[in-house]
């Protein structure tokens, strides 16, 4: 299965920094509406010990979303599997009506469509670079803006 390249993986891991449990999420919008915000959701985490080493598989969704006629639309929504060894894209959704699952688990083993999953990984390598270019706050050198006064007082 094809993983993200090093540059894209670094960006991905920065985006999910601090998100560790199912249900953890964040929205990054540093452009004031110029570009679509990025929504990040932890869908699941499986932790186990293999040969005395801690191991995890974290399933994460990264998405650009918009509302059309009251419905939340994906533009796109990509599901990833992150492990200590790398980050691999699993599925792609683009509304209206496009959904492709290129990698899945079957009886505890990973199965994947080689060409489709590799194409998705290539797309995601560029998408991570685009997200960084669009959402990285160069003044603060972070994806995450400083908390507002209201956030620090709460």
Per-region residue spans from a language model:
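Short intrinsically disordered terminal tails
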Residues: 1, 148-154
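Amphipathic, interaction-prone secondary-structure segments
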Residues: 27-83
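Generic hydrophobic, helix-prone segments enriched in Leu/Val/Ile
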Residues: 5-8, 40, 62, 126-127
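Non-membrane alpha-helical secondary structure
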Residues: 4-7, 32, 54, 112, ...
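An exposed acidic His-Trp-rich patch
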Residues: 72-142, 154
